[in-house]
Amino acid sequence: MLRQITDDVRIAMEKDPAARNFIEVLLLYPGVHALISYRMAHGLWNMEFNFLARALSQFSRWITGIEIHPAAKIGNRFFIDHGMGVVIGETSEVGDNVFIYHGVTLGGLATKKAKRHPTIADNVVIGAGAQVLGPIHVGRNTKIGSGSVVLQDVPEYSTVIGVPGRVVYSGISADMEDSDGLESFPDPVARAIECMLDRLPQMEKEIRMLKETLKQNGIDQKEAVVIDQETMKGNQS
């Protein structure tokens, strides 16, 4: 447990450029405090001291604003940045080297006593306010955008955004492989605009050719528009 706590502090120093030294992170980072409490509560839970485990978890929630159920399974080098509002449910499973921001929920959709929370594989980044719900699996090296609501399995090396969450990129990217945060997210709006700009020269060429064809056939452009509108109305009726 001590080694895990040490790793949790060190990963916070690696991930957060504002972290200055080991002591500062250990004493002043609520995400680290919540993890230390969780590690202790999880040990108590495994020894079947369930009430004490829940009591420690509840105390940590009051102090840090972060709720982690003591039965959840969390791997090594886990970092919660800022932390406030994070909720990790009872049957959640989190791999190694996972990085989440404030307001993230790993929640359940069912009320039955079974696996009802998500499984997060290694090297996943989850943006602020994202909701990952249900007994789904999020593959390794995936990045989930801020405010997304993820309800289905996500393949590894994916980028997920939106409500409901959708995969906008899937595959290995050198930028994403080397990135620890969200800065390497592909921008779907920018991509759509790029596609439109790529198509624009071809469309202009086709319009010029169409105008030339109309001119050669002695058809006025305005008349052609009127004819086309009448044709469309006839098809609709």
Regions found by a protein language model. Name each.
Residues 1-61, 175-237:
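Terminal amphipathic alpha-helical/low-complexity segments used for targeting or macromolecular assembly
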Residues 31, 36-39, 72, 78, ...:
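Solvent-exposed, flexible loop/coil residues
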Residues 61-168:
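Structural signal for interior beta-strand "rungs" in well-ordered beta-sheet cores
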Residues 166-178:
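A structural signal for small-residue-enriched, beta-sheet-centric alpha/beta enzyme cores
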